[in-house]
Amino acid sequence: DADIATLMDFRVDQSRGLHFIYVLPYSDRHLLVESTMISNQLEDKNWYRNAISQWLADRSIQIQSQLREEYGVIPMSAAQPKNAQIANIGAAGGSVRLSSGYAFSTIQTQMAVLAEAISTGERKVPEPYSKRLIFMDKVFNRALSAQSDHSAKLFMATGKTLDADQFARFMLGSAGIMEWAKVI
């Protein structure tokens, strides 16, 4: 369905780490498909390609042509600034949410704040997440690592207590105390 994005489909091989498929349709004829795994090791690129092919085949989605292929690794640990004189943004500025890999909206916020600061002669980039959120993400990641056989179930259980808007806020790092209480 060209109107529905699939953010995390866990109905894929979970034997090597927390693995999901992300699908973003651009139209009824174009879509972005991503195989994502939260793990301590990288798999061969063909492993990810095969996961995508299998996911598409299971849904009877036929690809006539592939326009592009990308490959990347998102760090799931805190960034360590190398030079205090440089205003780091993105992954280098700590924008990657440690428990989810989400970064896009935080990078947008950092850019807006940095642009405003530069206009006043400053170059300080705000911390993207609170110390409490970073601590909770580290606890969550430890739980996922310790229970790697059950990580998909643990991840899904985290989200089942929240409605869609609450889950989005939780994943973006802007959840309130009530959402945190539901998750814990």
How would you name each of these model-derived features?
Residues 4-5, 58, 68-71, 93, ...:
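Generic secondary-structure boundary/loop-capping signal
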